[in-house]
């Protein structure tokens, strides 16, 4: 076992740098625990507010004997022109704060450098979120290998890699509405330019930030991916080849959460009592409930949320609907009560205003479908739980994930969203799916057609394969061993 090697010879010390956004931090904290379980000393570097979000989960891990510590660094908000209190990506109230936020984040280079000068034992490896390009300079200065974590699947990472190598494909498009086929791909897949992460050119400082991110990607030692070989074998193999073998699939990392409290508080403390939620689910028939959650960042316009709600109502199926960013959705709260919606659906609709215990909900036998924004964490959690997906992508890697789920894996149904809803620009888009479209998509997913039955069967099989992948001898478990052996050899050769 690698844990024995690390104790007997050279003690491995990994320093983890999560990006300050829920969807990025959640899997990084899981990765910290997975590595610590193998005897690796872990130091997580983050800001005070972000450290507080994961205090309970990490405290339990540390109390259980895992060698994890957290080092807090203050975000230089004022120096970057960022108003105080904006320590997380999901707390930003406008697009105008995006560049100052990234500036502040990358100004952490100097205090982090001082940390590394004093760190003991000397770090053997950095694992950094791809949104933190300054960590490449730290890695170079201290001669430490840097492993990138993108938080995306191999399908998406390979797509981005292919398009970077074949820039003329995007350059030759006449408009953002025009579709193109991704070349050299295991499956025939079409996108428009805005549907691919980091493919749209934005001039000015944001372009410079993106270029720094791309450059840092090129200079990294390798990549870890929160996926498993059996889920997307062709894409995992091709991406590993593209990275000269230095790509390790180690997921689903969420499966390290075995304790009920860890599942319930994954990412944040839930805004509903866990027992109340489970009691409600217990009262519903097996496979009858649709779980609806569109992520921690997006706030769809009121007009679209109303159509979604009315579609859920007309589907006549029990549902749990999570509405996040609640402060921004006061108008929706008013509509819930004034229109009579909340009263009409009270017997079969559970509304969670804030953060939900998503892993616990998806694992419950009464849940039979998941309407998701297709963020990779949620997508993978749904598949891992054996739940078919109703896809409603918004931006970023989410359209890639939809293509994988619907076209390649055939475990999901599209809600019909083709247009990208850029973060902060939701009002410009308006209604993309009306209530009839919602009702129809829900029926297609949750109904008893042959296609629906086949989807359910297929996703259950993929869920079982996920469990096997993380067990000892499984593909992801073995890949963590391989990664640690690789870093161990590097560490020993450097000493």
Swiss-Prot record:
Its EC number is 2.4.1.368. The active site is at residues 24, 129. UDP-alpha-D-glucose binds at residues 358, 373, 376-378, 381, 397-398. The keyword Translocase does not apply. Optimum pH is 8.6. Keywords: Glycosyltransferase, Transferase. Belongs to the UDP-glycosyltransferase family. PANTHER family: GLYCOSYLTRANSFERASE, UDP-GLYCOSYLTRANSFERASE 73C5-RELATED. This is UDP-glycosyltransferase 73C11. It comes from Barbarea vulgaris. The lineage of its organism: Eukaryota, Viridiplantae, Streptophyta, Embryophyta, Tracheophyta. The gene is UGT73C11.
